[in-house]
């Protein structure tokens, strides 16, 4: 997504580029490490002028049946509009059979609660679903998701309801 955004002239700031995280020495427990990581990420997000947060995740469920994308949105202005637009684009292109809808995110999710900017959390699919897990690991599918996320962002910024791609 970062590379595609750059090709379109959209500046992006990554809050994390790998699973490797540098923790302060004082963070000795898992909870302290997670808090430290979350705090550093939210400071970076909230320091950006006119930011839009797109938090990308893969879902997991105890059973293999659930599938499809889902977009959750925060409270700041524009979050619902971006969330609904992104969800519409993802489901129409990748999982048209999905009955999921974009929804407000739980207040329990610190990153989304503390973000002061337009913010969405995108669940790209279920790693617990064997077919989706295979798809989610392919470059082609990752590129499709990235293109749809960027198109949704560009549509949102342009104030358009039509598909950009």
Language-model regions, residue ranges each:
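Active-site-proximal helix/loop segments of hydrolytic enzymes
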Residues: 1-165
């Amino acid at each position: 997504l970062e590379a595609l955004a750059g090709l379109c002239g959209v500046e992006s700031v990554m809050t994390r580029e790998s699973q490797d995280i540098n923790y302060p020495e004082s963070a000795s427990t898992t909870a302290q490490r997670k808090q430290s990581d979350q705090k550093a990420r939210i400071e970076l997000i909230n320091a950006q002028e006119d930011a839009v947060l797109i938090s990308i995740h893969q879902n997991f469920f105890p059973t293999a049946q659930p599938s499809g994308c889902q977009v959750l949105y925060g409270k700041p202005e524009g979050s619902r509009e971006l969330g609904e637009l992104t969800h519409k684009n993802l489901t129409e292109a990748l999982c048209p059979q999905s009955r999921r809808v974009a929804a407000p995110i739980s207040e329990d999710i610190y990153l989304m609660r503390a973000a002061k900017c337009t913010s969405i959390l995108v669940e790209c699919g279920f790693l617990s679903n064997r077919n989706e897990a295979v798809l989610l690991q392919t470059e082609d599918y990752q590129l499709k998701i990235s293109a749809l996320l960027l198109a949704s962002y560009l549509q949102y910024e342009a104030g358009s309801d039509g598909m950009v791609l």
